């Protein structure tokens, strides 16, 4: 694993492959550029994770900055995201601003955190969310954990991915027909890796 701790700039290295019979491939060269993070954020709990760079990118683009305790930042990669948190980050990633509102119109408005209300209204107005039908009315359920299926629907609507033929993709059972198109669409553009998650995992919370 190439881990040039504290290094910046460009580098390259050349390699060959040798098979069991001693045949040597033509050399191949890999060139890399290591740039300093603009945000100054480096997560203490993401060392060695392939997702560390993506986590830092979220901070640099103002989408999400983890908790700062003392002089260290923590991304908390195992913490399950709430519906409100995911919708807010998804909208921020697409440069969709939160509405300046005090009330959302959802029946569970009182339980929606103040910071999430503007995002809830923006998401509703943009057709990104429609809420959950309950006996009391349509609820946003900002504090509930968001599942991978629900997240796929949100991202599909935000990205406006062209619908694909469902028969070409490994989508889910009849119980998840409501999200199958979104999942297949995201698989077609490599947002979700086809076959990576089981049906049960797609129903689990996003971390």
Range-by-range predicted roles:
Residues 56-61:
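Mature N-terminal segment immediately following signal peptide/propeptide cleavage
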Residues 1-36:
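Acidic, turn/loop-rich segments in luminal/extracellular domains of secretory-pathway
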């Amino acid at each position: 694993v190439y881990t040039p701790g504290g290094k910046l700039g460009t580098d390259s290295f050349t390699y060959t492959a040798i098979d069991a019979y001693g045949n040597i491939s033509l050399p191949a060269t890999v060139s890399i550029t290591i740039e300093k993070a603009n945000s100054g954020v480096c997560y203490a709990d993401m060392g060695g994770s392939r997702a560390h760079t993506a986590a830092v990118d979220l901070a640099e683009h103002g989408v999400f900055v983890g908790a700062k305790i003392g002089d260290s930042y923590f991304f908390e990669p195992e913490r399950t995201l709430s519906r409100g948190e995911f919708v807010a980050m998804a909208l921020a990633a697409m440069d969709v601003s939160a509405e300046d509102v005090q009330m959302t119109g959802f029946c569970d408005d009182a339980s929606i955190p103040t910071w999430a209300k503007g995002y809830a209204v923006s998401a509703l107005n943009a057709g990104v969310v429609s809420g959950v039908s309950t006996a009391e009315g349509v609820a946003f359920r900002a504090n509930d954990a968001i599942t991978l299926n629900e997240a796929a629907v949100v991202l599909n609507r935000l990205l406006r991915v062209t619908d694909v033929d469902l028969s070409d993709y490994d989508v889910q059972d009849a119980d998840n027909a409501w999200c199958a198109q979104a999942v297949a669409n995201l698989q077609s553009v490599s947002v979700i890796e086809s076959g990576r998650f089981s049906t049960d995992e797609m129903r689990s919370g996003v971390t």
